[in-house]
Amino acid sequence: DLNGAAFVHIESESESAQSGAEHFTLHVPAGLLDEQERMVPVTLTVPGIHNARNASAAIIAAALLGVDIEKAAEVATSFLGAARRFQVCGTVSQVTVVDDYAHHPTEISALLDAARRRYPRSVIRVLFQPHLFSRTRTFAHEFAEALSKADDVIVTGIFPARELQRDFPDVSAMTIVDAAQDVPHASAQGDGTWISAVDDMQVAAQMLAMRCRPTDVVFTVGAGDITAMGAVILPAPGARHNLGDR
């Protein structure tokens, strides 16, 4: 159900996101909008249960303000998402690159849940750039747990933003990798080989590109300049035409 609104329920079609859309039914009990129970079908062009929840909250809010709920649901269908939120950059040789601004463990967890719904049969690879040394230190284990939902992860050097590395001499990409050693992972054999640290972002992107096979999906994740690495992993068509055939 919706967070903080137990009287509104979402019934999601688990396979729907594979088509690139999220289909669900919004159940509104009698007495909330009128005397009748309402069951409103909704289709979103953006995947993820978190997006379904956000859209449902917006639809209900609009309905409570007097907008016809079916009309509100229809308008929600036109929402194309925000830049750097599950933004598909392109596909070469059946390898797809998706960029996302997620930089907190909760965001990363939601992103990878959506990735599994959208690409249930694909290998999910992640190039993650941590944001802030302090956040990396505080949430290292939570980052590791969230990233464990991917099949293959490379953590790059930390984007410092307002902080200075000299103030955090013991914090690096390895802080997350070390924390991941105790995190269970279905694709690994308990040795943490699903995650590694490569400080140089360009090198990390090239390494991840070399691992790709057809139908793989690569996510560039973080609030820093990691977004530029999509061009490294996914060059202009023809620039590396054998991507995914290695």
Q: Where are the language model's segments positioned?
A:
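Short N-terminal binding/cap micro-motifs at the start of the first secondary-structure element
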Residues: 21, 52-53
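Compositionally biased, intrinsically disordered low-complexity segments
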Residues: 11-13, 45, 186
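Extended acidic/charged loop-beta regions that coordinate divalent cations
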Residues: 1-39, 83-85, 89
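ATP-dependent carboxylate-amine ligase
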Residues: 37-38, 47-50, 57-246
